[in-house]
């Protein structure tokens, strides 16, 4: 299983709405938001899922998302 922390940068003031959408995605755990323009989450990808696919999916989730950056990436046993 691939475990990746991500920081999602949004347009100013849009982090709360993006955080709500991220919290509904399967395999993602929302860790918090600064309430303005940043959301932090951790993803647990199973079955050969790729980090690039996650980053693309998050980037396409909402037009208010400006950038998605991985912060930490590690492998864990399933």
Give short role names for the model-derived ranges.
Residues 1-78:
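Long, contiguous binding/interaction regions
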């Amino acid at each position: 299983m691939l475990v990746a922390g991500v920081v999602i940068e949004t347009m100013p003031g849009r982090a709360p709405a993006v955080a709500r959408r991220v919290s509904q995605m399967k395999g993602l755990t929302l860790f918090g938001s600064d309430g303005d323009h940043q959301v932090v989450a951790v993803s647990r990808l199973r079955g050969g899922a790729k980090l690039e696919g996650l980053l693309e999916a998050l980037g396409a989730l909402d037009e208010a998302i400006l950038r998605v950056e991985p912060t930490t990436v590690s492998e864990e046993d399933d």
